[in-house]
Amino acid sequence: MPTINQLVRKPRKSKAKKSDSPALNKGFNSMKKQFTDLNSPQKRGVCTRVGTMTPKKPNSALRKYARVRLSNNIEINAYIPGIGHNLQEHSVVLVRGGRVKDLPGVRYHIVRGALDTSGVEGRMQSRSLYGTKRPKK
């Protein structure tokens, strides 16, 4: 344990906070071929693979996910929320942060109802989260 004198001479350093979604905090300068710091809430990307994954231990399901190459050339795994989707290889999607707790390596969500992703059909509640238009009366 340090003495007060030692702490006065060299104070404690606080830990730097790590980002939960690091791929959204990078931009890519294609002229210089180098990364820049550029925080963004969402990024556009192209699906390179669409498939299913099994969750961690107590849960059992086939969770839909897509491998996405973002506009900054970083490849990530992104979860496809909701029931049913129209995504396939080369679909252009919008990606936001937010991990899926029972899927290791999935730290991003695809935004439903944006770009090539359709909204969830027949959804009546929480429609804005799933990109569903208001039903006609």
From Swiss-Prot:
InterPro entries: NA-bd_OB-fold (IPR012340), Ribosomal_uS12 (IPR006032), Ribosomal_uS12_bac (IPR005679). Disulfide bonds: none annotated. Part of the 30S ribosomal subunit. Contacts proteins S8 and S17. May interact with IF1 in the 30S initiation complex. This is Small ribosomal subunit protein uS12. With S4 and S5 plays an important role in translational accuracy. Interacts with and stabilizes bases of the 16S rRNA that are involved in tRNA selection in the A site and with the mRNA backbone. Located at the interface of the 30S and 50S subunits, it traverses the body of the 30S subunit contacting proteins on the other side and probably holding the rRNA structure together. The combined cluster of proteins S8, S12 and S17 appears to hold together the shoulder and platform of the 30S subunit. GO terms for molecular function: rRNA binding; structural constituent of ribosome; tRNA binding. One of its GO terms (biological process) is translation. It comes from Staphylococcus carnosus (strain TM300). The lineage of its organism: Bacteria, Bacillati, Bacillota, Bacilli, Bacillales. It holds the Pfam family Ribosom_S12_S23. Residues 1-28 are annotated as: Disordered. Belongs to the universal ribosomal protein uS12 family. It comes from the Bacteria. GO terms for cellular component: small ribosomal subunit. PROSITE patterns: RIBOSOMAL_S12 (PS00055).
